[in-house]
Curated annotation (Swiss-Prot):
Stated family: Belongs to the cytochrome b family.
Function of the protein: Component of the ubiquinol-cytochrome c reductase complex (complex III or cytochrome b-c1 complex) that is part of the mitochondrial respiratory chain. The b-c1 complex mediates electron transfer from ubiquinol to cytochrome c. Contributes to the generation of a proton gradient across the mitochondrial membrane that is then used for ATP synthesis.
The protein's assembly and partners: The cytochrome bc1 complex contains 11 subunits: 3 respiratory subunits (MT-CYB, CYC1 and UQCRFS1), 2 core proteins (UQCRC1 and UQCRC2) and 6 low-molecular weight proteins (UQCRH/QCR6, UQCRB/QCR7, UQCRQ/QCR8, UQCR10/QCR9, UQCR11/QCR10 and a cleavage product of UQCRFS1). This cytochrome bc1 complex then forms a dimer.
Transmembrane annotation, as ranges: 33-53, 77-98, 113-133, 178-198, 226-246, 288-308, 320-340, 347-367
Name the UniProt record assigns to this protein: Cytochrome b
UniProt keyword list: Electron transport, Heme, Iron, Membrane, Metal-binding, Mitochondrion, Mitochondrion inner membrane, Respiratory chain, Transmembrane, Transmembrane helix, Transport, Ubiquinone
UniProt organism field: Eulemur rubriventer (Red-bellied lemur)
Superkingdom, taxonomy of origin: Eukaryota
Gene it is expressed from: MT-CYB
Length: 379
C-alpha cells in the first residue's frame, strides 16, 4: 500500500497534496477554512445536482418546481435548504479565509492570492445567478437591478444589458442562461481551486508568525487531517442548526412570492453576503460611480500586496495594524447592516461614512500604520 501511495501516478499527486505534504508546525485554526471551503463546494455541487434533477428553468414553472422539490420530492426540503444555507456557510468561510490572509500576510504569496480573488469573483457570480433561479419576487427584481448596473458602462452599456438578458427585460431567456451558467460555474471553481492549491504548494503555507516555515515542518496527515475534521464537524453543526431549526433565517420573505414584473418589492436587497458591497454601491449617488465603487471594493484586494509597507509579514506583533484590521472588520459589519436598511436618513449618511472609512483604512491608514511600526522597531 505504501508503494502504491508513493509511486502510482495519480495516488502520488494525492499523497503529495494531502498526506505527505510538509506543513508548518504552528498553523492555527484560522488555517482550517481552506478545507472547509472545499467541503462547502462539494456540498453545493452534490445538493445542486439533485436540485437540478427536479428544477425547470422556465419562467412559468420555475417557482412551482422549487415548491414541488420542497413538498413532493423525498427529502427535497433538506436538499433545497442545505443548498441555500450552504451558500451562506460558503461565504462565511470565504470571508474568514480572506480575513486570515490579510491579518497574517498570506497575500505575499501573490499567485495564490490573485487566483483567490478570481475565485471570489466567480463564487459571487455563481451565488448571484443561483439566487435568481427560484423566480421569486426578490430573484426577479434582484436580477433586474444588478444586471442593469452594466448599463452604466459608457457606449456599450445598454447593448450589453440586453445581450445578457437575451431580450428587452429579464425573462425566460435570462432564466435559462442563468441556470446554464449556475450549473457550469461550480466545476470551473473546482478547477480554479486546483490551480489555487498548485500555486500554494509551490511556495508552502504561511504561518501565524509570518516567518519561513522551512525550519520546522510536519506531515499534513494525520496532524492537520484530524484538525480539519474537527472544523468540519463544527461547520456541519452550524449548518444543521440553520437548516433544521431556522432554514429561512437568512432568506428574504419576498422570495416566497412568485416573480411579478408589474409589482416592485418595497425594498430590493441581495443576500446578506452581498450587502456590504451593495451598501458601498448605494452610498454614491452617481450610477457609474456606484458601479466603480462596487467593483473597487472587491478588486482592492488585488493591490494589497503593493500596499504592504511593513517589515514584518504578519500582524501578530503589530498592534497599530491589528487595531485598524479590527476597525475594518467592524466597518464591514456596519456596511452589511446598512445594505439591508431602506434608503433614508440616517442610513444614507452612515453608509457613506462607512464606505469612505472602508477605502481610507485599506488605501491610507493601514500602509501608514505599517510605516509607523517600522519606525517603532528602531526605538
Amino acid at each position: 500500500m505504501n508503494n502504491i501511495r508513493k509511486n502510482h501516478p495519480l495516488m502520488k499527486i494525492m499523497n503529495n497534496s494531502f498526506i505527505d505534504l510538509p506543513a508548518p508546525s504552528n498553523i492555527s485554526s484560522w488555517w482550517n477554512f481552506g478545507s472547509l471551503l472545499g467541503a462547502c463546494l462539494t456540498l453545493q455541487i452534490i445538493t445542486g445536482l439533485f436540485l437540478a434533477m427536479h428544477y425547470t428553468a422556465d419562467t412559468t414553472t420555475a417557482f412551482s418546481s422549487v415548491a414541488h422539490i420542497c413538498r413532493d420530492v423525498n427529502y427535497g426540503w433538506i436538499i433545497r435548504y442545505l443548498h441555500a444555507n450552504g451558500a451562506s456557510m460558503f461565504f462565511l468561510c470565504l470571508f474568514i479565509h480572506i480575513g486570515r490572509g490579510l491579518y497574517y500576510g498570506s497575500f505575499t504569496l501573490t499567485e495564490t492570492w490573485n487566483i483567490g480573488i478570481i475565485l471570489l469573483f466567480t463564487v459571487m457570480a455563481t451565488a448571484f445567478m443561483g439566487y435568481v433561479l427560484p423566480w421569486g419576487q426578490m430573484s426577479f427584481w434582484g436580477a433586474t437591478v444588478i444586471t442593469n448596473l452594466l448599463s452604466a458602462i459608457p457606449y456599450i452599456g445598454t447593448n450589453l444589458v440586453e445581450w445578457i438578458w437575451g431580450g428587452f427585460s429579464v425573462d425566460k431567456a435570462t432564466l435559462t442562461r442563468f441556470f446554464a451558467f449556475h450549473f457550469i460555474l461550480p466545476f470551473i471553481i473546482a478547477a480554479l481551486v486546483l490551480v489555487h492549491l498548485l500555486f500554494l504548494h509551490e511556495t508552502g503555507s504561511n504561518n501565524p508568525l509570518g516567518t519561513s516555515s522551512d525550519s520546522d515542518k510536519i506531515p499534513f496527515h494525520p496532524y492537520y487531517t484530524i484538525k480539519d475534521l474537527l472544523g468540519l464537524l463544527l461547520l456541519i453543526l452550524l449548518a444543521m442548526m440553520l437548516v433544521l431549526f431556522s432554514p429561512d433565517l437568512l432568506g428574504d420573505p419576498d422570495n416566497y412570492t412568485p416573480a411579478n414584473p408589474l409589482s416592485t418589492p418595497p425594498h430590493i436587497k441581495p443576500e446578506w453576503y452581498f450587502l456590504f458591497a451593495y451598501a458601498i454601491l448605494r452610498s454614491i449617488p452617481n450610477k457609474l460611480g456606484g458601479v466603480l465603487a462596487l467593483i473597487s471594493s472587491i478588486l482592492i484586494l488585488a493591490i494589497i500586496p503593493i500596499l504592504h509597507t511593513a517589515k514584518q509579514r504578519s500582524m501578530l506583533f503589530r498592534p497599530l495594524s491589528q487595531c485598524l484590521f479590527w476597525t475594518l472588520t467592524a466597518d464591514l459589519f456596519i456596511l452589511t447592516w446598512i445594505g439591508g436598511q431602506p434608503v433614508e436618513h440616517p442610513f444614507i449618511t452612515i453608509g457613506q461614512a462607512a464606505s469612505i472609512l472602508y477605502f481610507t483604512l485599506i488605501l491610507i491608514l493601514m500602509p501608514m500604520a505599517s510605516l509607523i511600526e517600522n519606525k517603532m522597531l528602531k526605538w
